[in-house]
Amino acid sequence: ERVTGAELSGMTYEGLADPKWKGRLVIRKSSNIYNKSLVASLIKNNGKKATAEWAKGVVANMARTPTGNDRAQIMAVAAGEADIAVANTYYLALMLSGKKGPEQQAAAKKVKAFFPNQNDRGTHMNVSCAALVKGAPNKANAVKLVEFLLTPQSQEHFTNNTFEFPMIDGVSPSPLVV
């Protein structure tokens, strides 16, 4: 409720450096792998210099010194300490599911997910993947494992239990993440 639809219209990750967000943003520490992958994505799309400037703007807009995990960022927004949290949707869904207790579920119900950069390259996503090592001694079994991970049964397990997005057609994401 503290962030308007007009503020989110056309919102991008790059926009998080805008001074209008001063004191309104929470995010994990820069050493976290999620932030490193987001920064790598921004470097790929915008270059090193622009991304360095972006990072300075984000730091200037932080509501507090980065602390805690993604759920801590969501809790901070729910508590009114900030207006925007950079967090993975599966943590929000985990909280909404009640698996982390009633306090976190209640907090999660106070926030909404938003997917930036929808007018251009799309939202940055962290990827979970499987790969085969050339010369692996059990290649046939490794292929079977990857094939199993790509079955509807496995993908539904991921979407319903870890709230990840599915990788195959015919399996829908959990309603808690969309």
Provide a role label for each language-model segment.
Residues 28, 87, 114-116:
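Conserved beta-strand termini and adjacent loop/short-helix elements that scaffold enzyme active sites
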Residues 21-24, 80-83, 108-111, 140-142:
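Loop/turn elements at helix/coil->beta-strand transitions in domains of secreted/extracellular proteins
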Residues 128-178:
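Mature extracytoplasmic/periplasmic domains
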Residues 54-60, 64-67, 105-134:
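Periplasmic-binding protein-like
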Residues 84-108:
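A ligand-binding cleft/hinge motif common to bilobed small-molecule-binding domains
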Residues 1-81, 92-98, 121:
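Extracytoplasmic ligand-binding site segments that recognize negatively charged/polar headgroups
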Residues 29, 89-90, 161-162:
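Short secondary-structure boundary segments
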